[in-house]
Amino acid sequence: MADQYEKRITWTIKNFSSLQSHAIYFDIFVVGDTKWHLLAYPKGYGDSINKCLSLFLGVPDPDDLPSGWKRHIIYRLTVVNQMSEKLSKQEVARGGFYPRSLTFGSQVMLPLTELYGGFLVSGQVKIVAEVGVLEVVGKSDVLEETLLVNGGINVNGFQVLPSQVESVNNLFKNHPDIASNFRLENTHLRTTYLNSLLCLTELLCQSPHKLSNVDLANAHCTLTCVTKAGFKLDWLEKKLKEVGKTRMQQLEQNLKDLKESLCWSSDDEDDLSRSVKT
Protein backbone atom coordinates (compact mmCIF):
# COMPACT_ATOMS: atom_id res chain seq x y z
CA MET A 1 0.00 0.00 0.00
CA ALA A 2 1.27 3.46 -0.83
CA ASP A 3 2.08 5.89 1.96
CA GLN A 4 -1.37 7.48 2.02
CA TYR A 5 -3.53 8.68 4.86
CA GLU A 6 -6.77 6.72 4.57
CA LYS A 7 -8.77 8.63 7.14
CA ARG A 8 -8.79 12.14 8.56
CA ILE A 9 -10.39 12.81 11.93
CA THR A 10 -11.13 16.25 13.37
CA TRP A 11 -11.55 16.49 17.14
CA THR A 12 -12.74 19.76 18.66
CA ILE A 13 -12.19 19.78 22.43
CA LYS A 14 -14.64 22.23 23.98
CA ASN A 15 -14.22 24.05 27.31
CA PHE A 16 -10.58 23.01 27.28
CA SER A 17 -9.42 25.24 30.14
CA SER A 18 -12.09 23.95 32.52
CA LEU A 19 -11.60 20.22 31.85
CA GLN A 20 -11.16 18.26 35.06
CA SER A 21 -10.46 14.84 33.53
CA HIS A 22 -6.90 13.55 33.59
CA ALA A 23 -7.45 11.93 30.19
CA ILE A 24 -10.09 12.34 27.48
CA TYR A 25 -10.89 10.11 24.51
CA PHE A 26 -12.22 10.67 21.02
CA ASP A 27 -14.83 8.22 19.70
CA ILE A 28 -13.47 4.96 18.30
CA PHE A 29 -13.03 4.99 14.51
CA VAL A 30 -12.00 2.36 11.97
CA VAL A 31 -9.05 2.54 9.59
CA GLY A 32 -8.19 -0.54 7.57
CA ASP A 33 -9.59 -3.46 9.54
CA THR A 34 -8.70 -2.03 12.95
CA LYS A 35 -10.37 0.12 15.57
CA TRP A 36 -8.43 3.20 16.73
CA HIS A 37 -8.92 6.05 19.16
CA LEU A 38 -7.32 9.34 20.10
CA LEU A 39 -6.25 9.94 23.67
CA ALA A 40 -5.42 13.40 25.03
CA TYR A 41 -4.08 14.54 28.39
CA PRO A 42 -5.05 18.24 28.64
CA LYS A 43 -2.66 18.84 31.54
CA GLY A 44 0.08 16.55 30.28
CA TYR A 45 1.26 13.00 30.85
CA GLY A 46 4.34 11.59 32.59
CA ASP A 47 7.17 14.10 32.79
CA SER A 48 5.02 16.66 30.95
CA ILE A 49 2.30 17.06 33.60
CA ASN A 50 1.36 20.74 33.98
CA LYS A 51 3.74 21.55 31.14
CA CYS A 52 2.31 20.27 27.86
CA LEU A 53 -0.76 18.90 26.15
CA SER A 54 -0.03 15.22 25.48
CA LEU A 55 -1.65 13.45 22.52
CA PHE A 56 -1.63 9.81 21.44
CA LEU A 57 -3.11 7.44 18.85
CA GLY A 58 -3.93 4.00 20.19
CA VAL A 59 -5.58 0.61 19.71
CA PRO A 60 -8.49 0.51 22.19
CA ASP A 61 -9.53 -3.14 21.90
CA PRO A 62 -6.41 -5.29 21.36
CA ASP A 63 -8.19 -8.39 22.67
CA ASP A 64 -10.48 -8.27 19.63
CA LEU A 65 -7.50 -8.87 17.33
CA PRO A 66 -6.08 -12.32 16.51
CA SER A 67 -2.99 -13.76 18.19
CA GLY A 68 0.25 -12.40 16.73
CA TRP A 69 -1.40 -9.29 15.27
CA LYS A 70 0.61 -6.28 14.19
CA ARG A 71 -0.25 -3.04 12.42
CA HIS A 72 2.37 -0.85 10.75
CA ILE A 73 0.94 2.59 10.11
CA ILE A 74 1.80 6.11 9.08
CA TYR A 75 0.16 8.90 11.03
CA ARG A 76 0.09 12.65 11.48
CA LEU A 77 -1.26 14.32 14.61
CA THR A 78 -1.85 18.07 14.47
CA VAL A 79 -2.84 20.61 17.10
CA VAL A 80 -4.25 23.33 14.87
CA ASN A 81 -3.24 26.95 15.34
CA GLN A 82 -6.55 28.60 14.56
CA MET A 83 -4.94 31.99 13.92
CA SER A 84 -2.06 30.88 11.68
CA GLU A 85 -1.92 27.46 10.04
CA LYS A 86 1.87 27.63 9.71
CA LEU A 87 2.22 27.69 13.50
CA SER A 88 0.30 24.42 14.02
CA LYS A 89 2.11 21.71 15.97
CA GLN A 90 2.55 18.34 14.27
CA GLU A 91 3.76 14.85 15.06
CA VAL A 92 4.44 12.86 11.87
CA ALA A 93 5.74 9.32 12.18
CA ARG A 94 5.37 5.64 11.45
CA GLY A 95 4.54 3.22 14.18
CA GLY A 96 4.42 -0.51 14.72
CA PHE A 97 1.46 -1.46 16.89
CA TYR A 98 1.38 -4.90 18.53
CA PRO A 99 0.18 -6.35 21.89
CA ARG A 100 2.98 -4.72 23.91
CA SER A 101 2.95 -1.44 21.97
CA LEU A 102 -0.57 -0.02 21.85
CA THR A 103 0.00 3.75 21.63
CA PHE A 104 2.13 6.24 19.71
CA GLY A 105 2.21 10.01 19.96
CA SER A 106 3.84 12.78 21.93
CA GLN A 107 3.97 13.74 25.60
CA VAL A 108 5.08 17.24 24.56
CA MET A 109 2.60 17.89 21.74
CA LEU A 110 1.96 21.49 22.77
CA PRO A 111 3.46 23.52 25.63
CA LEU A 112 0.60 24.86 27.74
CA THR A 113 2.27 28.27 27.72
CA GLU A 114 1.51 28.50 23.98
CA LEU A 115 -2.22 27.78 24.25
CA TYR A 116 -3.22 31.42 23.94
CA GLY A 117 -1.05 31.92 20.89
CA GLY A 118 -3.84 30.79 18.58
CA PHE A 119 -4.37 27.20 19.77
CA LEU A 120 -7.14 27.96 22.26
CA VAL A 121 -9.89 30.00 20.59
CA SER A 122 -13.38 30.50 22.04
CA GLY A 123 -12.53 27.89 24.65
CA GLN A 124 -11.82 25.24 22.02
CA VAL A 125 -8.73 23.31 20.96
CA LYS A 126 -8.82 21.66 17.52
CA ILE A 127 -6.95 18.43 16.81
CA VAL A 128 -6.61 16.66 13.46
CA ALA A 129 -5.46 13.05 13.10
CA GLU A 130 -4.59 11.37 9.80
CA VAL A 131 -3.95 7.64 9.67
CA GLY A 132 -2.93 5.19 6.96
CA VAL A 133 -2.27 1.46 7.37
CA LEU A 134 0.90 0.26 5.64
CA GLU A 135 1.03 -3.39 6.75
CA VAL A 136 -1.37 -5.80 8.43
CA VAL A 137 -0.35 -8.99 10.22
CA GLY A 138 -3.29 -10.98 11.58
CA LYS A 139 -6.46 -9.94 9.75
CA SER A 140 -9.42 -8.64 11.72
CA ASP A 141 -13.06 -8.75 10.66
CA VAL A 142 -13.94 -5.57 12.53
CA LEU A 143 -15.14 -3.74 9.42
CA GLU A 144 -17.40 -6.58 8.33
CA GLU A 145 -18.65 -6.91 11.93
CA THR A 146 -19.38 -3.18 12.08
CA LEU A 147 -21.37 -3.35 8.86
CA LEU A 148 -23.27 -6.39 10.12
CA VAL A 149 -24.12 -4.85 13.50
CA ASN A 150 -25.23 -1.60 11.87
CA GLY A 151 -27.15 -3.32 9.09
CA GLY A 152 -24.77 -3.07 6.13
CA ILE A 153 -26.62 -2.42 2.86
CA ASN A 154 -25.50 -3.29 -0.66
CA VAL A 155 -25.53 -0.26 -2.95
CA ASN A 156 -24.20 -0.84 -6.47
CA GLY A 157 -21.97 -3.65 -5.22
CA PHE A 158 -20.60 -1.75 -2.20
CA GLN A 159 -21.45 -2.56 1.41
CA VAL A 160 -22.35 0.70 3.15
CA LEU A 161 -23.83 1.80 6.45
CA PRO A 162 -27.47 2.92 6.56
CA SER A 163 -26.31 6.48 7.22
CA GLN A 164 -24.31 6.40 3.96
CA VAL A 165 -27.01 5.08 1.63
CA GLU A 166 -28.33 8.46 0.53
CA SER A 167 -24.85 9.84 -0.19
CA VAL A 168 -23.81 6.74 -2.16
CA ASN A 169 -27.07 6.68 -4.13
CA ASN A 170 -26.61 10.34 -5.06
CA LEU A 171 -23.02 9.64 -6.07
CA PHE A 172 -24.05 6.89 -8.51
CA LYS A 173 -27.09 8.84 -9.71
CA ASN A 174 -24.98 11.86 -10.66
CA HIS A 175 -22.08 9.78 -12.01
CA PRO A 176 -23.45 6.41 -13.26
CA ASP A 177 -20.11 5.20 -14.65
CA ILE A 178 -18.03 6.18 -11.63
CA ALA A 179 -17.18 2.56 -10.75
CA SER A 180 -17.21 1.05 -14.25
CA ASN A 181 -13.45 0.42 -14.07
CA PHE A 182 -13.38 -0.58 -10.40
CA ARG A 183 -12.28 -4.21 -10.30
CA LEU A 184 -11.44 -4.92 -6.65
CA GLU A 185 -13.56 -7.77 -5.26
CA ASN A 186 -12.49 -7.77 -1.61
CA THR A 187 -15.39 -6.34 0.43
CA HIS A 188 -13.12 -4.61 2.91
CA LEU A 189 -11.03 -2.91 0.22
CA ARG A 190 -14.11 -1.86 -1.75
CA THR A 191 -15.62 -0.27 1.36
CA THR A 192 -12.35 1.40 2.34
CA TYR A 193 -11.91 3.07 -1.05
CA LEU A 194 -15.55 4.12 -1.19
CA ASN A 195 -15.29 5.68 2.28
CA SER A 196 -12.22 7.61 1.16
CA LEU A 197 -14.15 8.87 -1.86
CA LEU A 198 -17.12 9.94 0.29
CA CYS A 199 -14.81 11.83 2.65
CA LEU A 200 -13.21 13.57 -0.34
CA THR A 201 -16.53 14.65 -1.85
CA GLU A 202 -17.70 15.90 1.54
CA LEU A 203 -14.50 17.91 1.96
CA LEU A 204 -14.83 19.57 -1.44
CA CYS A 205 -18.42 20.57 -0.71
CA GLN A 206 -17.15 22.94 1.97
CA SER A 207 -16.56 26.61 1.29
CA PRO A 208 -12.97 27.07 -0.04
CA HIS A 209 -12.12 29.60 2.67
CA LYS A 210 -12.67 26.86 5.29
CA LEU A 211 -10.07 24.59 3.67
CA SER A 212 -6.43 24.79 4.66
CA ASN A 213 -3.42 24.10 2.46
CA VAL A 214 -3.05 20.79 4.31
CA ASP A 215 -6.66 19.91 3.46
CA LEU A 216 -6.03 20.53 -0.24
CA ALA A 217 -2.76 18.58 -0.25
CA ASN A 218 -4.46 15.61 1.40
CA ALA A 219 -7.34 15.90 -1.06
CA HIS A 220 -4.88 15.59 -3.96
CA CYS A 221 -3.33 12.48 -2.37
CA THR A 222 -6.72 10.88 -1.76
CA LEU A 223 -7.88 11.67 -5.30
CA THR A 224 -4.77 10.02 -6.74
CA CYS A 225 -5.27 6.95 -4.55
CA VAL A 226 -8.95 6.33 -5.34
CA THR A 227 -8.43 7.09 -9.04
CA LYS A 228 -5.69 4.45 -9.24
CA ALA A 229 -8.11 2.00 -7.63
CA GLY A 230 -10.40 2.39 -10.65
CA PHE A 231 -12.90 5.14 -9.90
CA LYS A 232 -13.60 7.55 -12.78
CA LEU A 233 -13.22 10.96 -11.20
CA ASP A 234 -12.54 13.52 -13.93
CA TRP A 235 -15.36 15.65 -12.55
CA LEU A 236 -13.89 15.56 -9.05
CA GLU A 237 -10.43 16.44 -10.33
CA LYS A 238 -11.95 19.48 -12.04
CA LYS A 239 -13.73 20.42 -8.81
CA LEU A 240 -10.49 20.16 -6.84
CA LYS A 241 -8.69 22.42 -9.31
CA GLU A 242 -11.48 24.99 -9.04
CA VAL A 243 -11.37 24.90 -5.25
CA GLY A 244 -7.58 25.25 -5.29
CA LYS A 245 -7.81 28.23 -7.65
CA THR A 246 -10.43 29.93 -5.48
CA ARG A 247 -8.35 29.29 -2.37
CA MET A 248 -5.29 30.80 -4.06
CA GLN A 249 -7.26 33.90 -5.06
CA GLN A 250 -8.42 34.30 -1.48
CA LEU A 251 -4.87 34.05 -0.17
CA GLU A 252 -3.67 36.61 -2.72
CA GLN A 253 -6.48 38.98 -1.70
CA ASN A 254 -5.62 38.51 1.98
CA LEU A 255 -1.99 39.31 1.21
CA LYS A 256 -3.03 42.40 -0.76
CA ASP A 257 -5.24 43.59 2.11
CA LEU A 258 -2.40 43.03 4.57
CA LYS A 259 0.03 45.04 2.44
CA GLU A 260 -2.48 47.89 2.15
CA SER A 261 -3.02 47.82 5.90
CA LEU A 262 0.72 48.03 6.49
CA CYS A 263 0.99 50.93 4.04
CA TRP A 264 -1.77 52.82 5.85
CA SER A 265 -0.04 52.20 9.17
CA SER A 266 3.23 53.52 7.73
CA ASP A 267 1.50 56.65 6.38
CA ASP A 268 -0.13 57.29 9.76
CA GLU A 269 3.25 57.03 11.48
CA ASP A 270 4.75 59.52 9.00
CA ASP A 271 1.89 61.97 9.60
CA LEU A 272 2.31 61.62 13.35
CA SER A 273 6.06 62.13 13.07
CA ARG A 274 5.60 65.31 11.02
CA SER A 275 3.01 66.70 13.42
CA VAL A 276 5.32 66.11 16.37
CA LYS A 277 8.17 67.93 14.62
CA THR A 278 5.99 70.95 13.86
Curated annotation (Swiss-Prot):
SMART domains registered for this protein in UniProt: MATH
Coiled coil (UniProt feature): 232-267
MATH domain sequence ranges: 6-131
Organism superkingdom: Eukaryota
Record organism: Arabidopsis thaliana
Keyword field: Coiled coil
PANTHER family referenced in this protein's UniProt entry, alphabetically: TRAF-LIKE FAMILY PROTEIN-RELATED (PTHR46236:SF21), TRAF-LIKE SUPERFAMILY PROTEIN (PTHR46236)
Pfam families, per database record: MATH_2
Protein name from the UniProt record: MATH domain and coiled-coil domain-containing protein At1g31400
Organism classification: Eukaryota, Viridiplantae, Streptophyta, Embryophyta, Tracheophyta
UniProt-listed InterPro entries: MATH-CC_domain_protein, MATH/TRAF_dom, TRAF-like
Signal peptide: none
